[in-house]
A protein has these predicted regions:
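Small-residue-rich helix-loop
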Residues: 30, 37-192
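Single conserved hydrophobic/aromatic residue that forms the stacking wall/gate
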Residues: 1-8, 12-13
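Conserved catalytic neighborhood of penicillin-recognizing serine enzymes
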Residues: 10-40
Length: 192
């Protein structure tokens, strides 16, 4: 059953038969921007109980979490769910705090971890990190935009410890060099 709600110029579609895990897997593994927007609306719908929601309803909930994590929401801007807006502003520190928070919430962490691309195995990391210590030891989401390249997630060190990390490269002229740098950082941390 599919229902839709229209608020202002934002429209979100809810498929009540699609699990959050299925949407999250598609969103994270393949960097599916449409599912990112849909999940943002689903967050708003779940938090408000409203049938008609806009992306703003989900953004309000994210801003509440930013405050709970000890950050000032005024320092950040979220304009969409997929990260393609020029008006988004997040920091690596905030992303790491989100990841640490998710780790502390068993059910959330299990869903998130399962959905993240795995270095050298699948999703947007399928062709990265092969033949290195990062192979199969990095579960992370890639992100790219004009002159920006990012990688954030979890990596498993040699001693078995999980580490939350976020790397953002700005003013990038070569996305390939930025990705190589990120992969090398992961290798170095894993090797410690």
């Amino acid at each position: 059953e599919i229902g839709s709600g229209l608020v202002g110029s934002e429209m979100c579609i809810r498929d009540r038969n699609t699990s959050v895990q299925k949407v999250l897997n598609q969103l994270m593994k393949e960097s599916d921007n449409l599912n990112a927007e849909a999940l943002l609306c689903r967050l708003g719908a779940q938090a408000t109980g409203k049938k008609q929601v806009a992306a703003e309803d989900g953004i309000v909930e994210i801003m509440k979490l930013i405050r709970r994590l000890g950050h000032d929401p005024k320092d950040y801007k979220i304009a969409d769910g997929c990260g393609l807006s020029n008006y988004n502003y997040l920091s690596p520190a905030l992303l790491v705090d989100f990841l640490k928070y998710a780790y502390s919430q068993t059910e959330v962490f299990q869903m998130l971890y399962k959905s993240l691309p795995i270095g050298g195995v699948d999703g947007t990391l399928k062709f990265r990190m092969k033949g290195t210590p990062a192979f199969r030891n990095v579960h992370a989401k890639t992100g790219s935009f004009t002159a920006i390249n990012a990688l954030a997630g979890y990596l498993k060190m040699k001693n078995g410890h999980e580490v939350a990390f976020a790397i953002m490269n700005q003013n990038v002229l070569s996305a390939a060099k930025a990705r190589a740098f990120q992969d090398k950082v992961c290798e170095v941390i894993i090797g410690k």
